[in-house]
Amino acid sequence: MVELPFQQSQALNVRQNRALALAGVFQATQLTHMTAMTGQQSIGESGNFYFELLIKASLNIRPTTNNNTVQTLDFFNQLADISLGLKTLENCITQPFSNAPKSRLPKMRSAKLPMSYAMSLLQLEKKVYSNPEYVAIIEKAQQKILKQLSFFDNNYLHPSILANLAQTYVDTAGQINPRILVRGNAEAFKDTNHTNRIRACLFTGLQMAHLWRQLGGSSWNMIFSKRKLLQDIQALARLQYQVI
């Protein structure tokens, strides 16, 4: 038996495509959580790898798209690029949940915070993209950053790029209440570069949330159809390798 890496040419079904976009949201919120809790700008080689891929995708996700033809993998190279998000999403929906009334968050902080941020981003995305002014800000920022990259040797993690992504988040989602309150190293939050990185992470999550909604994603469906979502995640995990 030989395992071959997943081939991008293999099409995903509608639910899998949508689940993968949602995993992108959770990849962003997991990176947000990791950055905030460690209090360090660097989240390791693998963390930076996943973060850079999210930034690339977020700069190419447009306000409108043909949801009949778009695939989440159009914005990534392969399923492995979103493996952190798939694992985070799976952990969040399989962890024991709080017994508190109206609570739909896991008990464990390692799952609770990324899911809390993700749920907030899904709500914020709808408000941001229903406001033409915010949409225009995002489109203008995307064009500006894509041009800037040539000056920074296509370094998506350059402080100036992260600062622009962070400012775009502040100028859009950051203007809407309730704002996302990120928990982490209080001392590190005094560092502008650190907060820029966190806000840049949140911006990529906002963009992935927009793609998810374009693909037919619904917050209510995510909450009340966890079994189907888990099936889709597990199917995507198996698709990372083709067995012959």
Curated annotation (Swiss-Prot):
A GO CC term attached to the entry: plasma membrane
Main localization, broad class: cytoplasm
InterPro entries the UniProt entry points to: HflD (IPR007451), HflD-like_sf (IPR035932)
Subcellular location as annotated: Cytoplasm; Cell inner membrane
Gene3D superfamilies for this protein: HflD-like (1.10.3890.10)
Keyword terms of this UniProt record: Cell inner membrane, Cell membrane, Cytoplasm, Membrane
A Pfam family the protein falls into: DUF489
Record's bilayer topology term: Peripheral membrane protein
Family stated for the protein in its record: Belongs to the HflD family.
Alphabetized HAMAP family for the sequence: HflD_protein
Protein name per the record: High frequency lysogenization protein HflD homolog
Organism: Acinetobacter baumannii (strain ATCC 17978 / DSM 105126 / CIP 53.77 / LMG 1025 / NCDC KC755 / 5377)
Organism lineage string: Bacteria, Pseudomonadati, Pseudomonadota, Gammaproteobacteria, Moraxellales
